[in-house]
Regions:
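Membrane-interface extramembranous regions
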Residues: 1-140
Length: 140
């Protein structure tokens, strides 16, 4: 089971590193416009769009590298889960691009968002594994 969880952690890391790196290059990430629009609405336009996408890129790359190398895993999972929770906000603040018929028929964007449930469960699994490993070390 340990090897499987490590594979899940590294796989999530690769995905986050990849998606994050794309955001450093304008119009390369297919999620860029969605991310910029969401951040713009969440922060009432107070954060410059270019800055917001760069900060998101840094966040995603940090999570990716943390998962790939297994460093500060508990903290990385917290950053990861915070990010994942934020990915659901377009369902509420941008329903016109998330649904064809709210709340049951998703657009491609809505499907892209909802698939993150699987990522969240993987993150919880990684976190629980980290906690269990720490308990084992303390009892030895």
């Amino acid at each position: 089971m340990e090897k499987t969880i490590k594979l899940i952690r590294v796989s999530l890391g690769i995905i986050f590193l990849w998606y994050g790196m794309l955001k450093f290059f304008p119009q390369l990430s297919p999620a860029e416009d969605l991310a910029i629009t969401t951040i713009h609405k969440l922060f009432f336009g107070l954060i410059n769009d270019t800055l917001s996408i760069k900060l998101l890129a840094i966040w995603e790359v940090t999570v990716g590298l943390g998962f790939i190398f297994g460093i500060y895993t508990r903290y990385v999972v917290v950053l990861f889960l915070a990010h994942m929770i934020c990915t659901f906000t377009p369902l509420f603040i941008l329903p016109d691009i998330s649904f064809t018929h709210a709340p049951y028929a998703f657009t491609l964007v809505g499907q892209y968002i909802v698939k993150n449930v699987v990522f969240i469960l993987a993150g919880i699994l990684i976190y629980q594994n980290e906690i269990n490993q720490r308990k084992e070390v303390k009892t030895v």
